[in-house]
Design a protein with these regions (language model features):
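Active-site histidine-anchored catalytic micro-motif
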Residues: 1-150
Length: 150
């Protein structure tokens, strides 16, 4: 997300992923696909079906999805119910990457890149340096962190 200094609103521009991979000196072979740029609070099940369809039909068996934090657990559940035999990691940022050094987005993306390579097939949330199974995590709105339900 970007910040419009005139209206004071956040808006979506282009994905930052290619520049983030370059900045992180990532040597992995990555195919970036932008499916949509929508606030996760406005995401519908039709949007989630587009994500599921794309994952299901991807040649890759290891997939990272960047997603707004408010409904990423809901999307993870949606994808898990599809029972694809792929490792799918969903990550995001509590503070948008465009906000600079205060953002956790760069760290979370790096964590997702590492975890997706070693986790067994399934759907996971990766935030704050940890991975969580899709059905054992929640966003704690009081602390601003994701936490295990166990």
């Amino acid at each position: 997300k970007e910040y419009n200094f005139i209206t004071g609103e956040l808006y979506f521009k282009d994905t930052h992923l290619p520049s983030m991979f370059d900045r992180g000196r990532c040597t992995l072979d990555i195919d970036v696909k932008t499916l949509m740029m929508v606030d996760s609070l406005e995401m519908t099940d039709a949007d989630r079906e587009i994500i599921a369809y794309t994952c299901r039909n991807a040649k890759a068996d290891k997939i990272i999805i960047t997603h707004g934090t408010d409904t990423m657990v809901k999307t993870a559940k949606f994808l898990a119910e599809d029972q694809m035999n792929k490792t799918i990691v969903i990550t995001g940022a509590m503070i948008p990457y465009a906000f600079g050094t205060s953002s956790d987005g760069f760290f979370n993306l790096g964590s997702a890149l590492a975890f997706v390579q070693v986790l067994s097939p399934g759907v996971y949330i990766v935030m704050n340096g940890k991975f969580y199974h899709w059905n054992k995590v929640r966003k704690n709105r009081d602390t601003g962190y994701f936490e295990s339900l166990e």
